[in-house]
Amino acid sequence: MTVPVLTDTHCHIDAYDNPVAVLEDAHRAGIHVIAVTEDPGKYRLLRTRLGRRDGLDVALGFHPLRAGNASPHDLARFLRLLPQATWIGEIGLDFSRAGVKTRKQQLRVFESILADPQVRTRPVTVHSRGAERETIAQLAQAQVSAILHWYTGPLAAVDDALAAGLWFSINPAMVRSTKAGPLLRRLPPERVLLETDGPFARSGSRSAVPSDLIGTLDHLARLWDISPGEARKAVAQNEQRLRYHSEHPPA
């Protein structure tokens, strides 16, 4: 029986010392990697650096902390590159202490990106730190079926996100965190996807890598009271549904 391929929906592959070795390890583990980027320039550089290879999609990103200081030229460049992107991310909002001063600029960029119809036809991975309610509201209004990456916001907003058709990606650091426990128990299994946010997220004492998602899946299997094989099949089916929703957006 074929083992379903899993997807690391949010990985900063360019931040590892040896990205190619990490990708090769992921391929052996049956993990497809979505390499998120922080701005259009980094997207073009990473595509050139890694080229076309099995098991990898480079996502077109505009991190909110970059977007807050962006020029109109940067936004125009992002929108110009959209047709060639298979995934979008990381985009979003950040109203934490690090980003609150650029709130208005971030909102302007995020709204401009979401207004482009092409965004509704791509899987999207979204940053929402300190701006969870605003991010969910913007995505719901735009009818974008996005993934909330490493969600740390109020549990009360989770139902709004689910009603908006959003997904949640879980990483190795989250399953080791007591703080994330209530979120994991609240999420319906059919809305859960996987991520590492590596190398920034940790897996024990080291940076997380895509192959660590096998352990994340084992934790979810115990939480859902099913076998690891059943959990892998369930998450793989979620990934297929995400792609279907992206390819067939609401009219």
Where are these regions (language model features)?
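Mid-domain alpha/beta scaffold segments of enzyme catalytic cores
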Residues: 1-251
